[in-house]
Amino acid sequence: MPQQIELRDIALQAAQPLVHGVSLTLQRGRVLALVGGSGSGKSLTCAAALGILPAGVRQTAGEILADGKPVSPCALRGIKIATIMQNPRSAFNPLHTMHTHARETCLALGKPADDATLTAAIEAVGLENAARVLKLYPFEMSGGMLQRMMIAMAVLCESPFIIADEPTTDLDVVAQARILDLLESIMQKQAPGMLLVTHDMGVVARLADDVAVMSDGKIVEQGDVETLFNAPKHAVTRSLVSAHLALYGMELAS
C-alpha cells in the first residue's frame, strides 16, 4: 500500500476555469486540512482525487501520484482511499439496510464480510446495539448516526488514506464532538493519511498536522498547523484564523 499520495498541478474547468494548479501531498499518519470558503474549490479537488467529477466539469491538467508513480483515481477509490462524505444521507441507497451496505462494501474490496466483522466496525464507532443498527434503513437513522456509519464503512475498507469532506457539517455540537473523537481514534489506531476538508478552524486546530488554504480555486497558503495559526501570511488565512480566535475573545497578533 502507498505511503504517500500526491495531487500535482490539478486544473479543473467547466464553462470557465474552476481549480488552478492545485498541488497537495497526503502522507500516512498525518492529517492535511483543506480549508477555505464555500465555492473555493475544496470539494471539486477531492472529487478529482477520486475520479468522480460532476457532469460538465473536466480535468484539464495535472496528475495524481502514489509513492511518486502516476495512478488513475479509479484505482485509488475505495481500495486505497476511503471517503466520508459531507451529506451521508445521499451516500446510502434508501432501499438497502445498513447490513447490505456494509456487506457489499466489504465484498467489493475483497474484505471479510461476516457479521462479526461488521458488528465490530459498528461498535468501534460507538453505535449501540449493532444487530439492530444493521437492520435499519437510512431513513430510520439520524444524521449523526449516518455519519458514524460512514466512518464505520471507512474502517471496514482498511484503506491507507481517507478523504473526509466536511464530516461535521449540519450536526449538533454533541454529534460533532463524537465524530471528531472517532476521527482522532482512527488516526491513533490505523494511522492513515487523511485529507480533512472543512471551513471550521476549530476542527483544524484539533485534528490537523498541516493546512492548505484555498481561495478562488487556488492554494494561497500551505504549512504546518502551528505556523499557520501563529503567523498566517495570506489575507484569506488571516481572516479565517481571526474569526476563529474571536470566538474565544482573542485577537490575531499584528
Swiss-Prot record:
> Localized where?
Cell inner membrane
Where does the protein principally reside? membrane
- A single GO cellular-component term on record: plasma membrane
Taxonomic superkingdom: Bacteria
InterPro entries linked? AAA+_ATPase, ABC_Ni/Peptide_Import, ABC_transporter-like_ATP-bd, ABC_transporter-like_CS, Nickel_NikD, P-loop_NTPase
What is its membrane topology? Peripheral membrane protein
What family is this protein classified in? Belongs to the ABC transporter superfamily. Nickel importer (TC 3.A.1.5.3) family.
Q: What job does this protein perform?
A: Part of the ABC transporter complex NikABCDE involved in nickel import. Responsible for energy coupling to the transport system.
PANTHER family documented for this protein: DIPEPTIDE TRANSPORT ATP-BINDING PROTEIN DPPD, OLIGOPEPTIDE TRANSPORT ATP-BINDING PROTEIN APPD
Q: Subunit details for this protein?
A: The complex is composed of two ATP-binding proteins (NikD and NikE), two transmembrane proteins (NikB and NikC) and a solute-binding protein (NikA).
Name of the protein in question: Nickel import ATP-binding protein NikD
